[in-house]
Amino acid sequence: MGFDLYTIDFETYYDKEYSLSRMSTEAYVQDDRFEIIMVSCKKNDEPTQWFWSYEEEDYKTWLMERGIHRGAVLAHNMMFDGLILDRLGIPMPPMLLDTLCMAQATLKPHHRSISLDSCLKHCDSPIRKKGYVHNMLGRNLRSLTTQELHDYADYCVTDTDGTHWLFHYLKQRLPKSEYEIIDTTLRMYLEPAFDLDP
């Protein structure tokens, strides 16, 4: 691809009424209740790092210091993570990748669920998602103890490592031309535009 690969995962506040299962991704990210609890980021094959802050601007600074805006950025559901990058004011990276899209093409015809957890199990990954997110219903960042924050970070980092592993597993099953299609599809969602005739 010619770019450094950045794999990311955001963890955000949710509750029984305010969640991605009850509203559109756009409505969720634009809602006044939206809060980033943490983000994890893996550059190429380097160890995954995580970061938290009470201020959204700090997330932008942390991610851009790592050069995320100059690389290929990967997530499992980039429509969600990409909207957060846009909310933070991070320039859209030159390449967008999504293991959810890759799984849609390679696993969905034979496998009912393409959640990250299901994909990792189906592909016999040594990485397994952890269930700590279920303990976070209705919990915002300020409510977390130091131990809870670190437990959640372990979950977040595992998601990023799992996404990175899944990408390398699935890329053997997709032609390289599909990356451009995935990137274009994501940009039509994240950077919608009208082309008007002169």
Where are the language model's segments positioned?
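Common nucleic-acid-contacting/processivity interface regions adjacent to the catalytic cores
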Residues: 16-19, 176-198
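Active-site-proximal helix-loop-helix substrate-binding element of RNase H-like nuclease domains
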Residues: 34-37, 41, 45-60, 71-171, ...
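Flexible, charged surface loops at secondary-structure boundaries
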Residues: 1-2, 64-70
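A short linear-motif detector with a strong N-terminal bias
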Residues: 15-21, 30, 52-54, 64-65, ...
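Short secondary-structure boundary/capping segments within folded domains
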Residues: 27-33, 41, 63-66
